[in-house]
Regions:
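Substrate/ligand-engaging "lid" and interaction regions
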Residues: 1-292
Length: 292
């Protein structure tokens, strides 16, 4: 029911925790499928190597720590055009009418199709030239998967940016639409696909506000875990220069406000502490965050 793009610390330390709470409360029996479009070492060395489990270390104000094993990730996949089996599995998932939402923590630059001078990023340009097959840019990959969903079942779906940038849903929609319009101009897809994404009411791009600090893995936390008898927690540096560990350390405060626009339903995430409301509520929450 839920696919998340961006397998880094904000996902592991916050988003996956939300689904874990629902699992703990018996309000869901489903996990999240984690997908990475950029740093595939994370999937191999942090997810697969640890059976998709993460140790979440919460740093409390009184200097104590709370440790919890997160087991909400049911599957971890690489959106890698050079690994056809991974793409085939993703397309199988996107063809399922029961998929309710796909979400993102890929950073604001993950949505960018253009360089600062306005020219297209080469990966984005290549995707827009060749159409919905073998895409490599995150936005091309998602557009390709959405096209597969449209062709197979055309079921509703919420496409939810959870990245820390204002009007994030608008940014995500704009990038997807630009890719699809390029395909449409070359007659690689029909206008019916664009209408499905933007006019049918079947696909939504809700806005959200997120507030959570997940710093890089702390050596002090790792040492503390070792003193508790928890070993094998050494951080790694991936080939894409991500510094990441089998554990996530973060302070306790966290907020997520999402525009409640889910045409295929959604998990009861309000029970896990997520706030839902109108787009106006999201905007006001964003203003509150940046001005207080």
């Amino acid at each position: 029911i839920w696919v998340h793009f961006g397998s880094g610390n904000i996902f592991r330390g916050f988003i996956a925790q939300l689904q874990q709470r629902l699992l703990n409360m018996g309000l869901s029996d489903k996990g999240i499928i984690a997908v990475d479009t950029f740093d595939f070492d994370i999937i191999d060395k942090i997810y697969t190597a640890f059976d998709n489990l993460t140790l979440n270390v919460t740093l409390n104000a009184d200097a104590t720590v709370d440790c919890e094993v997160m087991a909400a990730v049911a599957e971890a996949l690489k959106a890698d055009a050079h690994q056809p089996n991974q793409i085939a599995r993703l397309k199988q998932i996107f063809a399922a009418p029961g998929l309710q939402l796909i979400s993102f923590t890929i950073t604001e630059k993950g949505y960018a199709l253009h360089r600062p001078d306005g020219s297209l990023i080469p990966a984005a340009a290549a995707d827009m030239e060749k159409g919905p097959s073998g895409c490599v840019h995150a936005m091309g990959i998602v557009a390709e998967l959405l096209y597969h969903r449209y062709k197979t079942c055309a079921a509703p779906l919420a496409v939810v940016s959870m990245d820390n940038c204002s009007h994030n849903g608008e940014k995500l929609l704009s990038s997807i639409r630009e890719v699809v319009n390029a395909w449409l101009e070359k007659r690689l897809v029909g206008k019916d696909f664009l209408d499905y994404l933007t006019e049918s009411g079947k696909v939504s791009f809700p806005w959200s506000m997120i507030d959570k600090i997940t710093p890089r893995p702390s050596e002090a936390v790792q040492k503390r875990l070792e003193e508790m008898g928890i070993t094998g927690m050494e951080p790694i540096i991936t080939s894409k220069h991500t510094y990441i560990a089998p554990f996530v350390n973060a302070e306790k405060p966290q907020y997520l406000v999402i525009e409640d626009n889910f045409p295929n339903g959604r998990p009861p995430l309000e029970k896990a502490g997520v706030y839902f409301g109108s787009r106006e509520v999201v905007n006001k929450s964003e203003a509150m965050k940046v001005t207080t």
